[in-house]
Amino acid sequence: KIYFDEFCEEFDYLIIANGHHWSPRIPTFEGDFNGELMHSHQFKNNEYFKDKSVLVVGGGNSACDIAVEVSRVAKKTSISMRRGYHFIPKFIMGMPSDVFYSKTLWIPQKIRLFLQKLALRFIQGKYEDYGLQKPDHDILQTHATINSELLYFIKHGKIKPQKNIRKFSNNSVEFEDGSIDNFDIVLFATGYKIK
C-alpha cells in the first residue's frame, strides 16, 4: 500500500526509476556567498525570480533555458560560462534541429561539418560579438547546446554573459576576468553527480 495525502492505493510492485540525474553537482569557489544558492533541479518557473538579480552558472541546455526564462521577470540576469559553447537553433528550416541533422547524414562528414560551421556563422555571427567565449572545439565534438533565444536575449541586453566565477564575497561574485557584480541568487545549472 502507498499512502498519499488524500488517498491510499495498493499495488503489486513498486518500481523506483529515478535515473542518475538526482544528485546535483555544484562546483565550489573561494569565499562565501551570502545570497541564495540554488541548483537547476529546483527551478519550476520564473515567478520566484521576479525583481531579483540572478546569476545562472552553466552553458548547457538547462542553463540557457533558465537564463532566458528568468530574464523575462528578473531585475538583472547574467550567465557565467567557464568555456565557449556552440548554440544550435531548436528549429532549422521548420524542423527540430535533430531531425534536420538526421536528414543530412548522407553528406560526407567533413563537408557536413564545414556546412554546419558556415551556416551557424552566417546566422549567428561570432560568439565573441555577444561577449561570449569562442568555443575551442568543433560543432558536435561535445554535447551541443540547443537554444534559439539566448543570443537574442544577450544582444537585447536582457542577459549579460560573464566568464567563469573566481570567488564569492558577501553578495558579490568576482569573475575570472576581474569584473565584479552583485546578485541575490546564484543558480547552478551544472549537471549532476553520476551515482
Predicted stretch roles:
Residues 1-61, 65-85, 89-91, 105-195:
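Flavin (primarily FAD) cofactor-binding/catalytic cores of flavoenzymes
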